[in-house]
Amino acid sequence: MIKKIPFFNYAHVFGQYKNEIQKIILDISERGSFILQQEGINFEKNLSDFTNSKYALGVGNCTDGLLLSIKAAGIRRGDEVIFSSHTFVATASAIYHSGATPIPVECGADHLIDINSIESAITSKTKAIIPTQLNGHVCDMDQILKICKKYNLLLLEDAAQSLGAKFKGKSAGTFGLSGSFSFYPAKVVGCFGDGGGVVTNSKEIYEKIFLTRDHGRAKIGEIVTWGMNSRLDNLQAAILDFKLSKYQLDIKRRREIATMYEEGLNSVKEIVLPRAPDSNKDKYEIYQNYEIEVVNSKMRASFREFLLKNNIGTILQWGGKAVHEFEGLNFNISLPYTEDLMRRSLLIPMNTSLSDEDIMYIIEKIRKYFGYGT
């Protein structure tokens, strides 16, 4: 039988805990408890405890979480917000739809926002920085906080891919005014559809988002401000609450896989691997994704084709383009380092459906392509 390893096995998300998930779905369906009910409250409490933040809110998705956070922070038309161009377009979209101007900057060798590029992009209109905690890795928050203090800037985090990742013992999403998370099905903690969350230590930010996520409604029949519809439904909240309870098992496996990749591929000089687990005591990586670089960009296409022929799925993050490269967004700038990285990088499988045998097979085929044998 030919081995087939998809980039991500969505069926495994359900099958892994089939009985528990079916019970949750049946229970909520039979009770008709669907929107802003106890399951949502429970999940918000557990999310705040998990991140060690004072407040947490469930929202429709991470994009909404970012938009609601930006608006709650008072960022508006005429303001500029700096972000890394190596991110999903949602980061820029949230800034744009708030009325502010998104300012993309370079990423660094760690694929996270480049610290020096932040300072170079600051103008009299700069209001905030939104670093993306990418692939389950956290930026150097000491340096970013130092810049925010120096220039009196707000800090909000796009932690869509990094729930549970840490920098010096502190959770992603808790360094600034707020942090937004994605619960898309492929995430470490993912629901069965779209879902998002926001954490904050600010009562003011919490109260503003609490209102604006539900049409600006304080209670039935009482609209106190302009709002939108971005509510995490009870079914998703209950599933997320269950999956949050299994978080440590998931992360343990991901870090085991990352260690196997490191041990099996670190001698392959034609590729660059992400930081290895525990290589930096200040950081705790959760490996939402495993993004590698091919040193020679001309080899990437044939490398991917070789893996595909051997039934190994890969993807190019964001379709292989940084945000500023999409013509329809009209950024009209060049970020050479990020552009070069996007021509060389790709994601290889990283999820709990993978067996040790699967990982060894992937390692074997990568080594073979670059002429290292087994």
Regions found by a protein language model. Name each.
Residues 1-33, 349:
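N-terminal "arm"/small-domain region of PLP-dependent enzymes with the aminotransferase-like
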Residues 32-80, 94-98, 103-105, 170:
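Phosphate-binding glycine-rich loop
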Residues 11, 39-46, 50-56, 116, ...:
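PLP-dependent aminotransferase class I/II
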Residues 110-191, 197-199, 347:
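Active-site phosphate-binding strand-loop segment of PLP-dependent enzymes
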Residues 67-122, 128-130, 306:
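Conserved PLP-anchoring active-site segment centered on the Schiff-base-forming lysine
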Residues 98, 150-151, 310:
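Helix C-cap/helix->beta junction micro-motif
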Residues 93-95, 147, 188, 235:
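Hydrophobic/aromatic ligand-binding patch that stacks against planar heteroaromatic rings
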